[in-house]
Amino acid sequence: MIKNFMQELKTQRWDDHRYYHHSRINQSLHFVSAASFLFAYAMLFFDPVVSALVGWLVSMTSRQAGHFFFEPKGYDHVNHATHEHKEEIKVGYNLQRKVVLMTIWALSPLVLYVDPTLFGLFTPWADPADFMRQVAKIWLTIGLGGLLFRTIHLFFIRDVETGLVWMTKILTDPFSDLKLYYKAPLALMKGELIDPGLEKHVKHA
């Protein structure tokens, strides 16, 4: 059982890399995201508010910017797949689902501004610092909620193992991405916009 779980984790991680991380800019942003996520993980034990602010404002924005703005959207000649096919088979949040998640995140401060109690859940914020700390709590909830929602969703549309593997992958991605993409910034500075190693690795996979 453990062996199958680890193999499925390896497969999900490899598919995510080969389908959705061709751009060196995207890879570099994932490296930045991974480093800041690890800082956010550490801060979770000391100050969850700071953890949420770093996790969303630095880690998530840099990570998603890479996917939205820099990853090629045309035909994938390495994997022989259209962009539409890759979006359809995406285990986690594809671009359409990410738009929904990021929209909820971006609009949440506005909801708190309009209703300082957030439907009676909070004591009304008294100053900008208090406002940001309450926003951070909302963002932390959105992050955890997004993770659990897709995990449970996968239980029903795939199976329990796929959902648990995906959740494990997401939580451990910062460690994996640091190892996987630490060379990307240097390659980018040398003018390399697309990872040339993907085609070789896909052919031998």
Regions found by a protein language model. Name each.
Residues 39-54, 110-137:
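Helix-coil boundary and interhelical linker segments in multi-pass alpha-helical membrane proteins
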Residues 46-71, 145-157:
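Hydrophobic alpha-helical membrane-embedded segments
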Residues 11-41, 86-101:
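Membrane interfacial helix-start motif at the N-side
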Residues 94-117, 178-186:
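C-terminal halves and exits of single transmembrane alpha-helices
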Residues 40-43, 65-74, 110:
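Membrane-helix exit/interface motif
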Residues 1-17, 68-92, 151-205:
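Membrane-proximal soluble regions of multi-pass membrane proteins
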Residues 31-42, 61, 141-144, 148-151:
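Hydrophobic alpha-helical transmembrane segments of multipass integral membrane proteins
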Residues 104-124, 191-203:
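Alpha-helical transmembrane segments and their membrane-interface junctions
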